[in-house]
A protein has these predicted regions:
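Juxta-kinase regulatory segment immediately upstream of eukaryotic protein kinase catalytic domains
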Residues: 1-24
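ATP-binding pocket architecture of kinase catalytic cores
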Residues: 27-204, 219-223
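Protein kinase-like catalytic domain
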Residues: 76, 139-142, 229, 247, ...
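Activation of the activation-loop gatekeeper triad in protein kinase-fold domains
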Residues: 228-234
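Active-site activation/catalytic loop segments of kinase-like enzymes and analogous catalytic loops
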Residues: 241-306, 321-337
């Protein structure tokens, strides 16, 4: 979908704040399912313009755009690598919505594969270390000092609130998607989570979506994080939820396939079944390569960095997979309703969400140990 923006109006607005320039361009970035990003060139400077999506999988699942601006502003004087913010605009008449502009950082995001320069055991080891060390920095932020002490509203009930919110998201999506297939396994996961919410021992800043494809690694070697991106789900809460989310994406060779026999039997004739292998089997599979930390090693490093003990692993990783399933079911509803910013991958969610349900059950049943 092409985003229509009055570029002349935007140019005038920016000129008043950044100074006049003869060179100006605005292009849409691909990827992402939440806030939209556009590449902005202003003279010799390059920026990223962030704006809300035309439609969301469920508005209550994502925090406001200006919250993201607020946290990036607060983190500029910390050890957490983030893009510097430039300006925020609450005047919707400029581009048709609120927006903010931030520094555009260069490098590579690791999603389906790793760049050639990182394809050695030494660089892979650094990727794991950098990823965990940066997460530890996020969880060590003094929120009072940076002005974020009232950033979240869930209090000590963060985990219970997450389970309730995600279950509500799934139920909302199923109002439209239930006619396509049943998701009893996902609701069983929701019940298990509700019955097994642990007591949170720590309350810190949490990113909410911390994983490799939201981390920009700088160009060159050694592997080094240039910036942590996509803070729209950040809040104050249980830091172990961030770690569990990261671990749910970090695959190992011993992990069973989430494409179980019953999934294959039910969907093997589906037009999108070949794509399921890419998303369910190949996504982040490179973390199985020689040199990458195992999940247990990541946990050990995190515990040493933060002093937090990672307990209740099955709950936190299952919560991570369930969170992804609930969000993906929202994307599937968007596809069925032909929402304005529906992406090409959204039809696949018909198959992906039941598969995620099986993956969560594998964690609960101990088939995918830490």
């Amino acid at each position: 979908m092409t985003i229509e923006i009055d570029e002349e109006r935007l140019r005038k607005y920016l000129a008043e704040r950044l100074g006049e320039t003869e060179s100006f361009s605005l292009e849409q970035f691909g990827g992402g399912n939440a806030n939209e990003t556009l590449a902005l060139e202003w003279g010799d400077d390059v920026y990223a313009l962030r704006k809300p999506p035309v439609a969301e999988p469920a508005p209550e699942m994502l925090h406001g755009l200006l919250r993201e601006y607020e946290i990036l502003s607060a983190l500029e004087e910390t050890w957490v690598p983030t893009p510097d913010v430039v300006l925020a605009c609450e005047d919707e008449s400029i581009i048709g919505d609120i927006f903010y502009v931030m520094e555009r950082i260069e490098g590579d995001v690791l999603e389906l594969d790793e760049p050639e320069r990182f394809q050695t055991p030494e660089q892979r080891r650094r990727i794991g270390a950098e990823t965990v060390d940066t997460l530890s920095k996020i969880h060590s932020i003094d929120t009072d000092r940076v002005g974020l002490s009232s950033f979240g509203d869930e209090g000590t009930d963060y985990l219970a609130h997450q389970v309730e919110q995600l279950t509500a998201q799934l139920e909302w999506a199923q109002e439209r998607t239930a006619e396509s297939r049943e998701l009893s396994v996902c609701f069983e996961i929701a019940d298990w989570l509700a019955d097994n919410v642990p007591k949170s021992e720590h309350h810190t800043l949490v990113h909410g979506d911390y994983k490799l494809d939201n981390i920009m690694f700088a160009s060159g070697t050694p592997a080094h994080i240039a910036g942590v991106l996509d803070w729209e789900m950040s809040t104050l809460g249980d830091p172990l939820a961030d770690l569990g989310w990261l671990l749910s994406y970090w695959t190992e060779e011993r992990d069973p396939s989430p494409v179980t026999d019953d999934i294959e039997e039910e969907y093997s004739d589906h037009d999108y079944f070949p794509m399921l292998d890419i998303y369910a089997e190949e996504y982040s599979k490179f973390t199985r390569n020689a040199g990458y930390h195992r999940r247990e090693e990541l946990v050990n490093r995190y515990e040493k960095q933060t002093g937090f003990e990672y307990t209740n692993d099955r709950f936190y990783r299952t919560l991570g997979v369930f969170k992804l399933a609930a969000l993906c079911e929202g994307f599937y509803r968007m596809f069925l309703e032909d929402a304005p910013n529906t992406k090409e991958s959204y039809p696949l969610m018909e198959l992906m969400v039941p598969t995620l349900g099986r993956q969560a059950k594998q964690i609960i049943d101990g088939e995918t140990p830490l």
